[in-house]
Structures are given as C-alpha cells and as structure tokens.
Amino acid sequence: FCACVYAGAWPVPLPLPTTFGGKDNYIDQLAIQLMSSDPKLLLYPEEIAEMAAAAAARQGCAAESWQDFARREAPEVTLPEASPDDICYLQYSSGSTRFPTGVAVTHRALLHNLYGHAETMNLGTNDRCVSWLPWYHDMGLVGCLLSLIANQVSGDYLKPDAFARRPLA
C-alpha cells in the first residue's frame, strides 16, 4: 500500500476470498471491482493466484503475485510529488446494503483522518493496537494500519477469518 502511494499509484485494497462464499462468487466480485477501478496491475498473494488471474483476465488487466513483483529489478524513475488534493487511494464500501462502491480518498482527506485519530485517541509511542479488521475495510486500513504508522504505534494483527470463526481463542 505505502509503496504504491509513494510511487504515485492508487492502491485499491480489495477483500480476500473468505468473505464471498465460494471461488466463483469471489472471481465474479473481484472482476466487477477490477472493472470499476480500471487498474493497470492487480497484485495478489500467491495463495489466490488462480482466482486473481481469472478475474484479471476477464477485465484485460495484468496480474502478478506480490512475491513475483517483489523480485523484479527496481527501475530508475523520478517519483511524482503528490499534491494534497490528488487521489491517494480508492476504498470500496463493504457492499452490505448494495454493491460495493469505490470512493476516491485524497491525500488531504487521509491526513485529516489520521490527525483526527491522533488527537481524539491521544495516541502515543507507548500505545499498542490489536486488530482483526481486514485492511480493505476503512477502519482496518486507516484506523488500525495507517494511523499506527503515522503515530508510530505498535500493532498486532490477527487473521480476520480466524478471529471471526473463534473470537475468544
């Protein structure tokens, strides 16, 4: 996520298959989100390679595992300078009341949100966060990942599907 923003790309955090009840449903959902976000490249964890490749192929989108992408030689490029009103990332709604909708979040909006977290939660470097929220979810991404980075707070993360199945384990 951070590397995409740094490079001037718009990361689009998308859910993993555990939330859709089956391989075909996940491929369908992912293909629709790819169509609406029109990415240049879909990066995915190797364990969902077959589903990610199928969804990307439907949309004519390049796809590569994070692991393969990380092995690429870094090109020599000049990184873009972001302006406050440039888009920072795309965030999809959960789709609990209708189909997930993509929302463009600017750098300014994200920084205001992070500032609000720091001020209202009085975060300090001795604080620690434990979260099971997935990073494609707004509270998981902003509240439990980016806010921790911005405020130098330590975090421990539980796998969302494992926590949902056995929250007291």
What are these regions (language model features)?
Residues 94-97, 133-139, 161:
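Active-site segment of SDR-like NAD(P)-dependent oxidoreductases
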Residues 1-6, 24-28, 133-150, 168:
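Conserved coil-to-alpha-helix start sites within the AMP-binding
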